Amino acid sequence: LFDAAGLMWLRPTSLQRLLWPAARRFALVAQEFDKLVGEQGLAQGSSWLAHRMAAGTQVSGGDHVPATGPAVILANHPGMTDTVSLLASLASRPDLRVIALDRPFLRALPNVARHLIRVPDHEVGRMGVVRAGVKHLKQGGALLTFPAGEIEPDPATFGRRKAVDSLRGWSDSYVLFARRVPQTRFI
């Protein structure tokens, strides 16, 4: 994972030696998560990881997600635990693809990467993301997207107002999905 994060060029320092055990544990958990995703699917692997990360999670609104047919789930992104819990809650959609920023860490998880539509850092390739999303929706698939494109303020930490204000920065790219695949359900 250090290599995937582009950190292998760093010479060992006292700080690195101090952080190495925690980084190794994280890498082993990520490796096991990816293995489970390959064997059992994204939702099951995410459920395993969510239980490791949090004492408990409560998800509501899952009944709004249709079991079949084109669907786009728009979600805020306050952090990793929320994301993993959301993925675990979408077990009814094994066809789920996640629109996510292209990061070396995610590419280092091959089983997880198969469920992603990666958004490049540069705008040149972003229409390819829309085309891939539209194709998946036309095949009756489900998409999960985080329209802010970044980690957002957690309402539990920063307050509801700051979290709601962050929604103004959401991309309206989901409108393209609605135009191209009008029967899509948006949740």
Q: Where are these predicted regions, by residue range?
A:
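Soluble catalytic domains of membrane acyltransferases
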Residues: 56-187
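Membrane-anchoring hydrophobic helices of lipid-metabolizing enzymes
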Residues: 1-71, 81-85, 113
